Amino acid sequence: MSIYVGNLSYEVTQDTLSAVFAEYGTVKRVQLPTDRETGQPRGFGFVEMGSEAEEAAAIEALDGAEWMGRDLKVNKAKPREDRGPSGGNRGGYGGGGGRNRY
């Protein structure tokens, strides 16, 4: 299971985020998604710890903590399929303008 880390500074790197979480146990993996077009960080990331106990300790200590001038939001990451509809499907009708044929 992963930890979601939100409200991150755009200056954060995988190394700096890993160092913060390493205080609470073994960091197995850090992901910092970036914007496809700009390559800039998107302000959130995911951290995978060595055990559930280490994850719980990190979440307890870091949720709401200030780091790099921002208040972190730290909690268990939800699996993709549990996040509800993606918003990609906007429904039927193909679109045609507002002109009346008659």
Swiss-Prot record:
Pfam families, per the entry: RRM_1
Q: Where is the composition biased (Basic and acidic residues)?
A: 73-84
Q: Which SMART domains match?
A: RRM
Mind listing the GO molecular function terms for this protein?
Answer: RNA binding
Which residues does the UniProt record annotate as the domain RRM?
2-79
Q: Where is this region: Disordered?
A: 73-102
Residue stretches of biased makeup (Gly residues): 85-102
> Which sequence ranges form a coiled-coil region, renumbered to this chain?
none
Give the record's keywords alphabetically: RNA-binding
PANTHER family the UniProt entry points to: HETEROGENEOUS NUCLEAR RIBONUCLEOPROTEIN 87F-RELATED
Protein name per its UniProtKB record: Putative RNA-binding protein RbpA
